[in-house]
Curated annotation (Swiss-Prot):
Organism from which the protein derives: Dictyoglomus thermophilum (strain ATCC 35947 / DSM 3960 / H-6-12)
Binding residue positions for GTP: D61, I62, R63, T64
Lineage: Bacteria, Pseudomonadati, Dictyoglomota, Dictyoglomia, Dictyoglomales
Protein name as annotated: Nucleotide-binding protein DICTH_1001
Chain residues that bind ATP: G10, L11, S12, G13, A14, G15, K16, S17
Family: Belongs to the RapZ-like family.
Length: 294
């Protein structure tokens, strides 16, 4: 995707830090409480990485000196660079912000000016009123859960890139049960019911990445049927995991030694899922039995 800039501002206690964490999980390079004057320089540094950093998200708040003037100048500079950007303004009801500060025991940035918490909130609203007019998106988080906040940010990002949910990561790991289950697995599929190439002396020295072994495993109807069942199951499950707010799904596929059957099946599932999702493939134990024929 093209380089994108996401600027978060708004009321203290409205969810700016949580929004930044969400964007970090989505692959953005994130900086909190940065002066507006530094943002154009930071953009140039990110662009100089030749695509290694594809998105920048920053939080800018009222603690910055000359906030309004510098913010306007920053927006003009970004516009001149012809870079797509969003300005998200977060707000919430006064009572909700007071409750959040009481729960976290943090200090509102304007309390240092000798104000009460409510006076600080009202003063901040006044100072940010003009900044709010620059916002491309305004979100009231008063009734939001963390999932609600993430869903709204994803909707905003979809105007950058319709495939923003590709930041959801799936890992597929083949493994051998005799070496233990992957401890981070969310879904585990056991393929030890399939005929084992290990018992064919001609196939034993090869791994499931070899055409001979792959053809042997996939020639079995039960293997082909199993792959289709798993595909259908994942078509059902993966969108639900995404809706639930998960950022990563770890799938483990195991056979006895993790060298033959699991490798073949993992390759097939990877080929299918990688057409739709950001998917990584690992063959954890494929080389552990490589000298077994000796």
């Amino acid at each position: 995707m093209d380089f994108q800039v996401f600027i978060i501002t708004g009321l203290s206690g409205a969810g700016k830090s949580q929004s930044l964490r969400i964007l970090e999980d989505l692959g953005f390079f994130c900086v909190d409480n940065i002066p507006p004057k530094l943002v154009p320089t930071l953009i140039d540094l990110c662009l100089a990485t030749n695509g290694k950093i594809s998105g920048l998200a920053v939080v800018i708040d009222i603690r910055t000196e000359n906030f309004l003037e510098d913010f306007k100048e920053m927006v003009d500079t970004i516009n001149s660079k012809n870079i797509p950007f969003k300005i998200l303004f977060l707000e919430a009801d006064d009572e909700v912000i007071v409750k959040r500060y009481n729960e976290t025991r943090r200090i509102h940035p304007l309390l240092r000016e000798g104000k009460t918490i409510l006076e600080s909130i009202k003063l901040e609203k006044e100072r940010l009123q003009e900044i709010k007019t620059f916002a491309t998106d305004i979100i009231d988080t008063s009734q939001f859960s963390l999932k609600d906040l993430k869903d709204n940010i994803l909707k905003i990002l979809s105007s950058f890139n319709s495939s923003v949910k590709s930041n959801f990561l799936i890992t597929i790991t083949s493994f051998g049960f005799k070496y233990g289950l992957p401890i981070d697995a969310h879904l585990v599929f056991d393929v030890r019911f399939l005929p084992n190439p290990f018992y064919d002396p001609k196939l034993r020295p090869f791994s499931g990445q070899a055409e001979e072994v792959k053809n042997f495993v996939l020639s079995k109807k039960e293997a082909r049927d199993f792959i289709e069942y798993v595909k259908n199951l994942l078509d059902f499950l993966v969108p639900l995991y995404q809706e639930e707010g998960r950022n990563i799904l770890n799938i483990a596929i195991g056979c006895t030694g993790g060298r033959h059957r699991a490798v073949v099946i993992a390759d097939e599932i990877f080929s299918y899922l990688s057409q739709k999702y950001n998917t990584h493939l690992f063959h954890r134990d494929v080389d552990k039995d490589r000298n077994i024929a000796k």
